[in-house]
Swiss-Prot record:
Lineage: Eukaryota, Metazoa, Chordata, Craniata, Vertebrata
The name this protein goes by in its record: Peptidyl-prolyl cis-trans isomerase FKBP14
Carbohydrate-modified residues: 176
Organism: Mus musculus
Keyword annotations from UniProtKB, A to Z: Calcium, Disulfide bond, Endoplasmic reticulum, Glycoprotein, Isomerase, Metal-binding, Repeat, Rotamase, Signal
Domain EF-hand residues, every copy: 135-170, 179-211
Length: 211
């Protein structure tokens, strides 16, 4: 449920900021190495442990490497919740342990107009990423408690709306009332399985196949 909310927030945010239903630029994905046997593929909400190197496309200069700049240690992150670049969330789905990918990330899915550190504004980025481990993502009990304002173990439309408004404000997005209402209705249509007008703790924590 939490990951569906994040995906819904991201989709609406993109629409609002672009001013039209224009598709986002896509990441170019090249598989450099793939294991013969793959027991599990990454999906939204998974914890991933990776080594990576990042380069500027324009001149091939290295701006970060976990091997060189992170005491040689790989990094953990959660896929699909905007914890990392949008380009990573898009380009690292369906990946196997032992797989290596090269991602070409356009500015809109990287650091955009602002840039960051050694990365100039409007830079296309190249990442070589090696997946070392996949784990189940964090439990969503804490998120449910945060949303359940009256502690009745079920979420009303008002409670979900308040949560979404806070998440939008956290990311600096301004969305009008009608957008919030439409998003809440869409969430309840998908998550309120018994159609009683509330999302129960069970419905909230249930992991849907499409996630």
């Amino acid at each position: 449920m939490r990951f569906f909310l994040w995906n819904a927030i991201l989709a609406l945010w993109v629409t609002v900021l672009s001013g039209a239903l224009i598709p986002e630029p896509e990441v170019k994905i090249e598989v450099l190495q793939k294991p013969f046997i793959c027991h599990r593929k990454t999906k939204g909400g998974d914890l991933m442990l990776v080594h990576y190197e990042g380069y500027l496309e324009k001149d091939g200069s290295l701006f970060h490497s976990t091997h060189k700049h992170n005491n040689g240690q790989p990094v953990w992150f959660t896929l699909g919740i905007l914890e990392v670049l949008k380009g990573w969330d898009q380009g690292l789905k369906g990946m196997c342990v032992g797989e290596k990918r090269k991602l070409t990330v356009p500015p809109a899915l990287g650091y955009g107009k602002e840039g960051k550190g050694k990365i100039p504004p409007e830079s296309t980025l190249i990442f070589n990423i090696d997946l070392l481990e996949i784990r189940n993502g964090p439990r969503s009990h804490e998120s449910f408690q945060e949303m359940d304002l009256n502690d009745d173990w079920r979420l009303s439309k008002h409670e979900v709306k308040v949560y979404l408004q806070k998440e939008f404000e956290k990311h600096g997005a301004v969305v009008n009332e009608s957008h919030h209402d439409a998003l809440v209705e869409d969430i309840f249509d998908k998550e309120d399985e018994d159609k009683d007008g509330f999302i129960s703790a069970r419905e909230f924590t249930y992991v849907h196949d499409e996630l």
